[in-house]
Amino acid sequence: MLAIENYLILSAILFAIGTIGVLTRRNAIVIFMCIELMLNAVNLTFIAFSRHLGNIDGQVFVFFVMTVAAAEAAVGLALMIAFFKNRESIDVEDVNLMKL
């Protein structure tokens, strides 16, 4: 069995990749995928600590995070589809051009 440090290092690397992707990309779908990667990195940390400490609290919290992430995915994709129909682009710089 791997030590908890290995899981935490992997989680930190995944979170860093997601953060870099959010900060450097302009495509809304890629940014959305990077945010999901960051959420999964946090979930990995919760699971690692849950297994290390021997309780189930982290696993239950991961279940709730995954539920919220699924709802976020549905709403986010619906907004992207509506934005694409309006502007025919999913570039985040075009969002500033929208008026209410």
From Swiss-Prot:
Task: Determine if Chaperone is one of this entry's keywords.
Answer: no
**Gene3D superfamilies under this entry?**
1.10.287.3510
As recorded in UniProt, its EC number(s) are 7.1.1.-
Q: How does it sit in the membrane?
A: Multi-pass membrane protein
This enzyme catalyses: a quinone + NADH + 5 H(+)(in) = a quinol + NAD(+) + 4 H(+)(out)
Q: Which UniProt keywords apply?
A: Cell inner membrane, Cell membrane, Membrane, NAD, Quinone, Translocase, Transmembrane, Transmembrane helix, Transport, Ubiquinone
* Listed transmembrane segments: 2-22, 29-49, 61-81
Any one Gene Ontology biological process term? ATP synthesis coupled electron transport
MF (Gene Ontology)? NADH:ubiquinone reductase (non-electrogenic) activity; quinone binding
Any one of the GO CC terms? NADH dehydrogenase complex
As for subcellular location, the record says: Cell inner membrane
Top-rank EC class of the record's enzyme:
translocase
Q: Which PANTHER family match?
A: NADH DEHYDROGENASE SUBUNIT 4L-RELATED (PTHR11434:SF21), NADH-UBIQUINONE OXIDOREDUCTASE SUBUNIT ND4L (PTHR11434)
Q: How does it assemble?
A: NDH-1 is composed of 14 different subunits. Subunits NuoA, H, J, K, L, M, N constitute the membrane sector of the complex.
Q: What does this protein do?
A: NDH-1 shuttles electrons from NADH, via FMN and iron-sulfur (Fe-S) centers, to quinones in the respiratory chain. The immediate electron acceptor for the enzyme in this species is believed to be ubiquinone. Couples the redox reaction to proton translocation (for every two electrons transferred, four hydrogen ions are translocated across the cytoplasmic membrane), and thus conserves the redox energy in a proton gradient.
Family from the record: Belongs to the complex I subunit 4L family.
Q: What is this protein called?
A: NADH-quinone oxidoreductase subunit K 2
The lineage is: Bacteria, Pseudomonadati, Thermodesulfobacteriota, Desulfuromonadia, Geobacterales
